[in-house]
């Protein structure tokens, strides 16, 4: 029974990176209203493990579902898709 597990990979924006090795990622999706057929934005915040502390607020990142790191942290940073360009 060699069953391959399907990895859940989501893309979102980092909204907090204040804690050590932990980032908060805001994941937005659009769902269709069942009666009015209009698309509505829905969002979810997840905590992800950032082992190298490489993310800052505003980065576009890809996270993958992983084994639980703590009570609320069940995601791991896969890659930084786009860095936030800071204007000084």
UniProtKB/Swiss-Prot annotation:
> What CDD domains does the record tag this protein with?
Ribosomal_uS17
What are the coiled-coil residue ranges? none
Query: InterPro entries annotated for this entry?
Result: NA-bd_OB-fold (IPR012340), Ribosomal_uS17 (IPR000266), Ribosomal_uS17_bact/chlr (IPR019984)
Write out the GO MF terms: rRNA binding; structural constituent of ribosome
Its keywords, alphabetically, are: Ribonucleoprotein, Ribosomal protein, RNA-binding, rRNA-binding
SUPFAM superfamilies for the chain: Nucleic acid-binding proteins
Q: Which Gene Ontology cellular component terms are annotated? A: cytosolic small ribosomal subunit
Sum up the protein's function in the record's words: One of the primary rRNA binding proteins, it binds specifically to the 5'-end of 16S ribosomal RNA.
Q: How does it assemble?
A: Part of the 30S ribosomal subunit.
Q: Which family does it belong to?
A: Belongs to the universal ribosomal protein uS17 family.
Q: What is this protein called?
A: Small ribosomal subunit protein uS17
Taxonomic placement: Bacteria, Pseudomonadati, Pseudomonadota, Gammaproteobacteria, Candidatus Pseudothioglobaceae
